């Protein structure tokens, strides 16, 4: 039985612009065929057991020719698999989606199309440029500025000028100058407003507000693909309506190690504020056997992972939280409190280790911290409950990072491993907790603490640091 191909528009760059239907298609895919402009955050939605095929299409460089991509889709569908063809922007707006479906239709393969947000409208919107405005234009026109190799553009420039609407040129970095010259030759005033938006909707987005006559000078400043060329009176609204460039962390590159499940929330908080977030692979917790306590025993948890280790031990023995009814639950630090609350439990006591009542106390800690806690709480029974496994990370260019955000000691360890051999002296860090900040300083970093032990407080501290520069 033949499978199915779903063409999914991934949107223009911001992973948050993927549609709900597109997300569902990715999460259910057995094969995903994707292009260069697809964000890594979207690729993370692909099931671990799905086959990934990178066809790497780039402007002027197609490592996998279009006809071969068409054959890949056909072949995988004929194997009976659910195939997602993930394309930047919208599949049917200069995305060659129609060409890919023609072969599938000819071979009676079932297919579906999930439209995406096109860069033609999203990139101007992120630059504060509405594609239409009744006081300025009555139409918008999306035009390709791409030409086949060794061929000239065949556009009716006089007709475009007569339209007196907003003109949006896609795939035209190499032809911006030519297009501007031809528009002026067709009667457009040299001082007519236009804009260039590079990397639209991405944190590294740049824009140039200029005129048709000044476009060539902007291009000489090194405009790179992907970029769009917008010609129209609506470009004059950008200074008033540009919300994207006003975000407090715009253009900042912030490294976020991911040692615990809620670290992605920090990445989201920073992205919403305009930062380019670089995430390190998350160290994983390996839970160790925990001897379950009897009634009347005090259980002291030293981190959120201690709560996870305890609940895992209960589950492995066929028990649940009711088995803790006779125990006194204590939390050393707010992180442990949050970990316990995740399971609907509240501690009987929370505070610092030096105030813990140690009689009949079993203290759950990370394996490599057992000796430290044994010294701090000599009368407690110290039980190593988990160890941290570090994953191999890609090399990090510290010179390109503005800040590192550390949420736990484990995140500092992950960073140290990823930067092994490089001394991060002077690299700025914002940390949750005094111990985390101390560990960062031990690496030679310029580490500061957030006012509170929350992700929101950490984001606010980063904002304040950037505002004070």
Where are these regions (language model features)?
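A short alpha->loop->secondary-structure connector
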Residues: 105-108, 131-133, 185-191, 318-321, ...
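Class I S-adenosyl-L-methionine
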Residues: 1-15, 20-117, 216, 221, ...
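Short, well-ordered beta-strand core segments
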Residues: 30-32, 52, 130, 167, ...
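General beta-strand structural signal in soluble alpha/beta enzymes
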Residues: 34-35, 54, 84-88, 111-116, ...
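Conserved beta-strand elements of the Class I
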Residues: 6, 30-33, 84, 141, ...
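Class I SAM-dependent methyltransferase SAM-binding "motif I" and its flanking Rossmann-like core
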Residues: 90-93, 97-163, 349-350, 354
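Conserved anion/nucleotide-ligand pocket segment
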Residues: 150-195
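Signature of uroporphyrinogen-III synthase
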Residues: 13, 65-69, 73-78, 177, ...
